[in-house]
Amino acid sequence: MLMLLVRGTHYENLRSKVVLPTPLGGRSTETFVSEFPGPDTGIRWRRSDEALRVNVGGVRRQLSARALARFPGTRLGRLQAAASEEQARRLCDDYDEAAREFYFDRHPGFFLSLLHFYRTGHLHVLDELCVFAFGQEADYWGLGENALAACCRARYLERRLTQPHAWDEDSDTPSSVDPCPDEISDVQRELARYGAARCGRLRRRLWLTMENPGYSLPSKLFSCVSISVVLASIAAMCIHSLPEYQAREAAAAVAAVAAGRSPEGVRDDPVLRRLEYFCIAWFSFEVSSRLLLAPSTRNFFCHPLNLIDIVSVLPFYLTLLAGVALGDQGGKEFGHLGKVVQVFRLMRIFRVLKLARHSTGLRSLGATLKHSYREVGILLLYLAVGVSVFSGVAYTAEKEEDVGFNTIPACWWWGTVSMTTVGYGDVVPVTVAGKLAASGCILGGILVVALPITIIFNKFSHFYRRQKALEAAVRNSNHREFEDLLSSVDGVSEASLETSRETSQEGRSADLESQAPSEPPHPQMY
């Protein structure tokens, strides 16, 4: 039998390790003994009434045996009643024999709540910990849900049930506004594609200039020009609908069709037409530039904002293609072409959505609608049920009167207007039963619409604050540091992360060993 001295993991204590020889080819048996020269001294390792000294994450306290005896099922209660040092070591992370102190590598804030539990018998919820971390700490120390105080039990259970959707409803917490790690990793993965591309650094800089208004001064100027062009295009479309710009539309259109020419060029004002061409040229430049600079073509066509950019210029080119296809046809075909062109012109209204690329509120609204399809579906279902019920009642009460309630489908319009509390007044009931049905329809609409609107508003507030936090982080960051961060995307490897993780753990162990005093101070007694 060989007797060796080994060091502890946290404190500089010595223990004896007995190595028992085994037959050739077998493994040696290592046995740790509590103190040198061995456990067979006939002396109990701790007195039953001795106070328990613990160190939880650097917080040292001393607990009386009487307080721990009240809760023998907890970890500290079982540690106090441990019959041997080996049994006690299984319940803690380390043990200092010189100071007779037990070490636990756990959350020190929860430990303070644990001390309050041993004094009062009630555990209170910590707001600094999420419900899952709080539950893990409580399970580790041997506490159940029954240990929670009555003032915190309902709140804890509610937060535990709603925590998976906390970003929907509990959006006031700072963590709910923080950027999602998955989104950050997706951005880094996209930017890493430029590393192997031709002129990757230049393309990445141009891409960020066009996509991120807060990236640099040129990106801010580009954003201002883009917004100005969008507003000019919308203004031109609105001005074209004024009566003074349509005075000669009918006569000019008839003359153009009779001459076998397209009526579109004649009807448009020359100034507005040139402004439209300029806007189309700018929009085409934006779409083509983003397509050429995009890190992934497939992801480019899947992005909603890029699809909006394509739709904003698509009507113009479809009109040109239709004109070329029917260029050699007669005036009748031009008449049909005019109707198609009017439909394409109507699609120009979608250009206002291009402002979403430069507006935090519009992007937040889009994200809200994307994540609120269940609530929107419930709202539409409630409205459909209410409209169907009250329309049938109104039809039954008003069908004898000639006031517009001739059929149930005709009453659907009245029911929709009434339930949404718009109240155009074009169709109104005149009988007492019809007015009672209208009153119920209005009150039901107020109650039904208000239920899901609150959830949708909370989601919008969350996404708006989150988007503002992202923009503030980019705006307040140094340009050079931001560029260095982007340049180091494809230089981070799993091995380097593992090395840094091991280095931080070694540094933490060294700090803990250096902070462990040879003669620990007298901790507070509980």
Curated annotation (Swiss-Prot):
Keywords: Cell membrane, Ion channel, Ion transport, Membrane, Potassium, Potassium channel, Potassium transport, Transmembrane, Transmembrane helix, Transport, Voltage-gated channel. GO terms for cellular component: membrane; nucleoplasm; perinuclear region of cytoplasm; plasma membrane; voltage-gated potassium channel complex. A motif (Selectivity filter) lies at residues 421-426. Residues 409-420, 421-428 dip into the membrane without crossing it. It is found in: Cell membrane. Residues 240-270, 323-337, 396-408, 429-435 are extracellular. GO terms for biological process: action potential; potassium ion transmembrane transport; potassium ion transport; protein homooligomerization; regulation of potassium ion transmembrane transport. Gene3D superfamilies: 1.10.287.70, Potassium Channel Kv1.1, Chain A (3.30.710.10), Voltage-gated potassium channels. Chain C (1.20.120.350). The chain crosses the membrane at residues 218-239, 271-293, 305-322, 338-358, 374-395, 436-464. InterPro entries: BTB/POZ_dom, Ion_trans_dom, K_chnl_volt-dep_Kv, K_chnl_volt-dep_Kv5/Kv9, SKP1/BTB/POZ_sf, T1-type_BTB, VG_K_chnl, Volt_channel_dom_sf. It is a multi-pass membrane protein. Residues 1-217, 294-304, 359-373, 465-526 are cytoplasmic. The keyword Transmembrane helix applies. Pfam families: BTB_2, Ion_trans. It comes from the Eukaryota. Its main location: membrane. Residues 491-526 are annotated as: Disordered. Residues 499-511 have a biased composition (Basic and acidic residues). GO terms for molecular function: potassium channel regulator activity; voltage-gated potassium channel activity. Belongs to the potassium channel family. S (TC 1.A.1.2) subfamily. Kv9.1/KCNS1 sub-subfamily. The transmembrane segment S4 functions as a voltage-sensor and is characterized by a series of positively charged amino acids at every third position. Channel opening and closing is effected by a conformation change that affects the position and orientation of the voltage-sensor paddle formed by S3 and S4 within the membrane. A transmembrane electric field that is positive inside would push the positively charged S4 segment outwards, thereby opening the pore, while a field that is negative inside would pull the S4 segment inwards and close the pore. Potassium channel regulatory subunit that modulate the delayed rectifier voltage-gated potassium channel activity of KCNB1 and KCNB2 by altering their kinetics, expression levels, and shifting the half-inactivation potential to more polarized values. While it does not form functional channels on its own, it can form functional heterotetrameric channels with KCNB1 and KCNB2. Each regulatory subunit has unique regulatory properties that can lead to extensive inhibition, significant changes in kinetics, and/or substantial shifts in the voltage dependencies of the inactivation process. Heterotetramer with KCNB1. Heterotetramer with KCNB2. Does not form homomultimers. This is Delayed-rectifier potassium channel regulatory subunit KCNS1. It comes from Pan troglodytes (Chimpanzee).
